[in-house]
Amino acid sequence: MRKMKKLAALILTASMAAAALAGCGGKAADTSATTSTTSAPETTAEAAKAETTKEAAETKGLKVALLLSGAANDMGWCQTAYDGLKVLESDYGCEISYTENLTPDDIEAAFADYAANGYDVVIGHGYEFGDPAVEVAEQYPDTKFIVTEGEVSAENVASYVTKCEEGGYIMGMLAAGLSKSNKVGFVGPIQGASLVKIMNGFEDGAKAVNPNIEVQTAWTGSFTDTALGKEAAQAMIDNGVDVIGHCANESGTGAINAAKEAGVFATGDSYDQNALAPQTVVSSSVYHIPNVIETAFQSVENGTFEGGIYNLGMREDAVSIAPYHDLDAEIPQELKDEIERTISAITEGQFTVPLDTKVR
């Protein structure tokens, strides 16, 4: 199961870990919600089948739904969860459904609708799904509710928090090490604690490489407005910034576009975003939400599900950085070595990225 054995084992040994602050998910998109349902293909339990096929047969009939605040194909935060949902369909034979572009006012009803229609597991992707999940969970005790980046728990509600600040820290190191102007910038969407911790991680990482680096920041107020992201990044570029970071979903795509047009580097978030601008996006902070979702689902499948709050980072294979792709030669070897040493220190428990959720 790829990295799942390691991830699951670490979660079990750290069961009921201390609650983290709110996560990396965003607020709702401006478009109307849409729902899509897919039935998994038929499977058989023949002895010669591979392990994943056997598991798919054993869990055939489990229904899993996913709630998203943005588009499932955003090449960012929402798509990480959608990819995880597709793993449950392909590897476990689950019947899946998802609703995207949910507004805050629609979340509770969406949870209730899936639970009332017999879904075994309903996943809310982002901290904003936490309170609605708890509200609905009491009415549907036989349904398991999973919230990524949540800070809530109940008997049938579990939150899985990604240590996004770790990825932000490494992206900050990379940005500072590449900057020639001694100025880097970071574009965020809203001042939620889960997003502030990424921005602050970026700043801390940058200053770990260069204590004198200037870190310019901006909040667009939107996860989905690419124009606002581009405008914020362009203002920084006009002010001398030559590396742009972000944690702003589609708004962050606008920031990458500004960097591309200006001929400066950018770092991606949530997903390997190099494909958006191969000569611009030098690396990305990648959140392995498919791993997290699979681990959470396995606890339902094998009967070990417990309500609680679980914290997952690089050490648990929940966070990593994307390859440097064709820009590898642009990065000084000394910087690459320093980044690798830092990642090793994090994964070996020798260094903890500071968790700071206060706006600076």
Language model segments and positions:
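Bacterial Sec-dependent N-terminal signal peptides
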Residues: 1-11
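C-terminal motif of bacterial Sec signal peptides marking the signal peptidase cleavage site
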Residues: 19-23
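A residue-level marker of the well-folded mature domains of exported/periplasmic proteins
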Residues: 26-41, 46-360
